[in-house]
UniProtKB/Swiss-Prot annotation:
Subcellular location: Cell inner membrane
Description of how the protein assembles with itself and partners: F-type ATPases have 2 components, CF(1) - the catalytic core - and CF(0) - the membrane proton channel. CF(1) has five subunits: alpha(3), beta(3), gamma(1), delta(1), epsilon(1). CF(0) has three main subunits: a, b and c.
Family matches, as CDD domains: F1-ATPase_delta (cd12152)
Family: Belongs to the ATPase epsilon chain family.
Function comment: Produces ATP from ADP in the presence of a proton gradient across the membrane.
NCBIfam families: ATP_synt_epsi
This protein's UniProt keywords: ATP synthesis, Cell inner membrane, Cell membrane, CF(1), Hydrogen ion transport, Ion transport, Membrane, Transport
InterPro entries: ATP_synth_F1_dsu/esu (IPR001469), ATP_synth_F1_dsu/esu_N (IPR020546), ATPsynth_dsu/esu_N (IPR036771)
Protein name in the entry: ATP synthase epsilon chain
Top-level division of the source organism's lineage: Bacteria
One term of GO molecular function: proton-transporting ATP synthase activity, rotational mechanism
Length: 137
């Protein structure tokens, strides 16, 4: 067994990332979890958050929307609706989107489908800003 895992991040449009990493931290729906080589196989739902590849100053951060993760001992596959590298985030544009979503959300009934759509937009905007700063949300 090696000391690395193959990581793939896939959206409906394209393969965003295919890398070999030593450690990946993933935003599971029940909280963040780390994956090293030899991890027990599992499937998890994902929430919007930040995928961190590596550790310390060399870490790469990727904002992802909700989706699913398949973990195997030597491979992690993330299927998400959207993904953006932290270094490519336009902070001003994302902040504007976040603020608009928050304003709309404040007047929307929590049981509505519109509320869920706005909540997803807000969560992904927050994930993008966190990825830009190299933080987990």
């Amino acid at each position: 067994m090696g000391v690395t895992v193959d990581l793939e991040v896939v959206t409906p449009e394209k393969l965003i990332l295919s890398e070999t990493v030593q450690l990946v931290t993933v935003p599971g729906s029940e909280g963040y979890f780390g994956v090293l080589s030899g991890h027990v196989p599992m499937i998890s739902s994902l929430r919007s958050g930040v995928v961190r590849m590596g550790q310390g100053d060399d870490a790469v951060h990727l904002a992802v929307s909700k989706g699913f993760a398949e973990v195997r001992p030597d491979r992690v596959t993330l299927l998400v609706d959207r993904a953006v590298f932290g270094k490519k985030v336009d902070a001003a544009a994302v902040t504007k989107i976040r603020d608009a979503a928050q304003d709309e959300l404040d007047g929307t009934p929590t049981e509505s489908e519109e509320y869920e759509t706005l909540r997803d937009k807000l969560d992904f905007a927050n994930a993008q800003l966190a990825a830009l700063e190299g933080e987990l949300v």
